[in-house]
Regions:
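Conserved acetyl-CoA-binding loop-helix of GNAT-fold acetyltransferases
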Residues: 95-110, 127, 131-135
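Conserved active-site tyrosine of GNAT-family acetyltransferases
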Residues: 20, 62, 133, 138, ...
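Acetyl-CoA-dependent GNAT
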Residues: 7, 33-92, 103-105, 109, ...
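Conserved catalytic-core motifs of GNAT/GCN5-like acyltransferases
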Residues: 69-72, 77, 119-122, 134, ...
Length: 164
């Protein structure tokens, strides 16, 4: 697949939502329990600008096939040099290098914006995301046991980090 990356724009809100919402209602890769409305998605995009960008991956037809973002790791000031990444790939585009392209660009953007480290918080059974992050230079630094509950199951979160 021919993958192109660019900063996300408001016009991408529906495409991003169409990738994200199935994960909300059908999987544990996000701990959100309620699908996003278009207004929620536009607000999310508005919050991801400057040093905490959202990006999209498009195919040759300029259709959005994945998205990623950098978010503040925690609100307290001493955490301001650390970001948390998120990467989502459309189910039909998985295995085509979209996730690696998105994560590589997020690492590049985080470095360019002067952040010191990036954190990934990955549900414990999401082996593809753990492998993706490992392949992009992230190391496992711990596991938070049973900190989320979805679909009647307790969920662990694997913490991974990369120094930028």
């Amino acid at each position: 697949m021919d993958v192109h990356l660019r900063l996300a724009e408001r016009r991408d809100a529906e495409a991003i939502r169409s990738i994200y919402n199935p994960e909300v209602v059908e999987s544990t890769v996000t701990f959100d329990l309620v699908p996003r409305t278009i207004e929620d998605q536009v607000a999310w995009l508005d919050d991801h600008s400057g040093g905490h960008p959202a990006i999209v991956a498009t195919d040759g037809a300029d259709d959005v096939v994945g998205f990623g973002s950098l978010s503040p790791y925690r609100p307290r000031a001493a955490y301001s040099t650390t970001v948390e990444d998120s990467v989502y790939v459309h189910r039909d585009a998985r295995g085509a290098g979209v996730g690696a392209a998105l994560l590589g660009e997020l690492v590049r953007l985080g470095t360019a914006h002067g952040f010191h480290s990036a954190i990934a918080r990955i549900v414990g059974n999401h082996e593809a995301s753990i492998a993706l992050h490992s392949g992009c230079g992230f190391s496992t630094i711990g596991t938070e046991r049973e900190i989320g509950r979805k679909f009647g199951r307790w969920l662990d979160v694997v913490l991974m980090q990369r120094m930028l």
